[in-house]
Amino acid sequence: MDQDIKTIIQYPTGATEFDIPFDYLSRKFVRVSLVSDDNRRLLRNITEYRYVSKTRVKILVDTTGFDRVEIRRFTSASERVVDFSDGSVLRANDLNVSQLQSSHIAEEARDSALLAMPEDDAGNLDARNRKIVRLAPGEVGTDAVNKDQLDTTLGEAGGILSEIKQTQQDIGDYIEEFANGTTYLKNIVMVYNQGSANGGETAIVLDRTDEVFAVPVIYINGDRQEVGFQFSYDNTTKTITLVKPLQRGDFVVMLTSEGTHSLASILAGPDGASRIGASGGLTVQQAIDRILESHIILPQWFGARGDWSDTTNTGTDDTAAFEAAIEMAVTLNYTEVYVPAGSYLITRELNLNGGNRNTRLGARIRGAGWASSVLVFKAPAPETPCISIIGTPGSHTSKGVEKLLIKSHPSTTGQGIGILCRNTCFAHVTEFLIANMNIGICLENYMTAGSFTEFCYFTNGRLFTNNINIQFNKVQNGDNSFHGSNFKNIQNQVKKNGGIGVQIVGNPQGAAYLYNMTWDMQFFGGAGCIAMDLNYCNTDYVGGKLTGESDLTFKADGNSRFDFHGRFDSIGKVIWDTATEGARTGGTYVFANRTSLENAVMTNADAGRLPAGVSARPLPADWADRNNNGVYPATFHIRGPNIESMGFVTYDSPGNGFFFGQLPFQGNIKDFNPRFWFNSGGTSFNTAATAYTMKLVNGEGLYFSDTTIRALSDGNVSLGEWNRRFKEARFTSWDIGTSIVPTSTATKDIGTNSNRIRDIYLANSPNVTSDSRKKSFIKPIDEALLDAWETIPFSQWKLNDSVAEKGSEARWHVGYIAQKVEESLQAFGLNAGDYGLITIGDDGFMLRMEECLVVEAAMIRRKLGLTYK
């Protein structure tokens, strides 16, 4: 077989495996057949043949009755390998594949045409050593004759050569069917004048209802003719103008698409995109229109290359293309700029407002993912941002950044700002990575009061070894208010040896005031890593969860405080580098579980009220990550059937306990002053006061001091009850147990002249000391005393207290009246005060009745004349 035929090959049967000598786009475009002179069988893939490799097939059926195996490429014009379903991106590879498919179709058309018995270089029809079957009889002298006609002619001497004319008609019909058939790519192959030129033509008008955009190639008797050389084409009139006129009988095939030149011709026109099909019955132009309607702009439309190489450190400057894309997005009513995968060199600020505008609305910029869409920023100055979101305070913006990696150019490492949010509200930045810049993210209140940044959201991002990963910056007289800006799932990789994770910068004109924020952030540190740096900063209601690893330093000047409603937990070393802590603070830094004062020794620790060397820190409510240490100290819930109680626990070791105390107004936590404390063993209760009152709701209670324990009111409090008694009591003057015993002899009294005991009930008479060794000046009773005693009358009476209590029921008492005793003694020249018979106090007179009765007995004895023996 003549191997000028590129897409059809036949092998003799006998083998089972056969090579595919041509390239193809899809296996469905390759046809394998068994053929003979009068029969053909198209085989099915997998069941009747299979692919051994990409370039070899194996026959699986019996080849009896066939002498050849034919492998033919038959590329479909309707089943496009590339359908441009995603009209948002026209890739060079897709265009090449589409061109290749068109080229294959054209090549197959050429082979089909050549197989249709083309002319050779001498102008003769060439059957290529094959039989011509179904040949009509010739009609004129120059017609071919078939075998029957030849036999008839030879046998009958009559010519039926006129039937050969039908052969020409059949060939023309076949070629025309080939050109117009639905199984071939329309507007690709056309045959002129049914396959035979009239002769002398210098122009061919294409009689087609569909538009013919370009005719880059024609074949005249198989000889390739190039547009611009052997002919020209006017697509407005559909006219081909030939350099040389045609000869009679020339076979002319016109190809309307071949190679890159043809496809470029189609796409070059203003309506080129409307000529390319896409999925769903759309054209590429329709797909582009829908993209524009959905507000997505590509920098590639404006020449972006995305060809930066980290290996060679070279690439096209795509800044202008990005600026143009942003400008178009703004023009199309604040739409989105989509950044396909690639690395793009940027050398100027990309303002999402477009140009140098400062407006509320602007474009969003979105990449294919931070691992795919990369902006390499060659910063012209340390403070120049790669992307800026600049707006008007107090109103929400449409601007945002998503799925991008922003990193520094190798020549400007540590320079520039990744993303600047200035005087803007509600900007969203998500799925990002910013690396090796001067500042990763800067939130800036710029220049004037009322210029503030608020409610910006940063999620699912990593800030990697920028000089400052996150900065809040109050510039000059910019508003001090930063509020509502939240960070969620942020990895803050701090640059070693001086890098800062979060920096908050105010100024003497006003502190940067952060409030109503939620932070979920993980700090990664190391040698010289500063987690936070405060300069003129204050906060309210900033909360969330912060964690750390490796060494992290927290710095602050003397004008700053950072209160965080959430924990900061770290498995690394934490260093507090703060100015002198203020007198009114729990620490410059305060978290739910720790404070920058956590290593400061408490003032009262050395006063004996607290254990030596202790410091204060907040008590977390949860037990997590404390299980290995017994979860102390802690408060906890005690539960059971009908039990809902509180528990308090501390470490059971000397020096531990529960401390309750006070701070002066606006005092420092390290100046905590314990007032009451219990030891952990429950063996002591202590107070720092010199006097203490235990008071009941009705006002009764006890008063304790260093000298006294007494009731709070007079006569209402009992010590013990009839069935709840004290066993013993020890006092300075008395010991009370089984006896009431004074602590020293003859020095204690029971009652006083003004506070008397009403009744004493005794089982035996009182014992009175009468030991001569305890007495001095012993002598007989004075006669004058006995004389006076004879004049003292006996009386009976009722006590006033009893009358007041019992009235007429008060009982009578008998005895002496003390005043009468005094008067009688005075009448006989005696001083009653010289005798222990009478006690005179502020509240009245009292008599020692046992001594009075002794005088009475001595007086009677004298009257009876009884004398001592």
UniProtKB/Swiss-Prot annotation:
GO biological process terms on file: adhesion receptor-mediated virion attachment to host cell; proteolysis; symbiont entry into host cell via disruption of host cell envelope; symbiont entry into host cell via disruption of host cell glycocalyx
Q: Please give the chief subcellular localization of this protein.
A: virion
**Does this UniProt record's set of keywords contain Ubl conjugation?**
no
Query: What protein does this entry describe?
Result: Depolymerase 1, capsule K3-specific
* CDD domains xref list: Peptidase_S74_CIMCD
- What organism is the protein native to? Klebsiella phage KP32
PTM per Swiss-Prot/TrEMBL: Proteolytic cleavage and release of the chaperone in the host cytosol stabilizes the folded protein. The cleavage gives rise to the mature tail spike protein but is not essential for catalytic activity.
Domain (Peptidase S74): give its ranges: 770-869
Q: Which UniProt keywords apply?
A: Degradation of host capsule during virus entry, Degradation of host cell envelope components during virus entry, Host-virus interaction, Hydrolase, Protease, Viral attachment to host adhesion receptor, Viral attachment to host cell, Viral tail protein, Virion, Virus entry into host cell
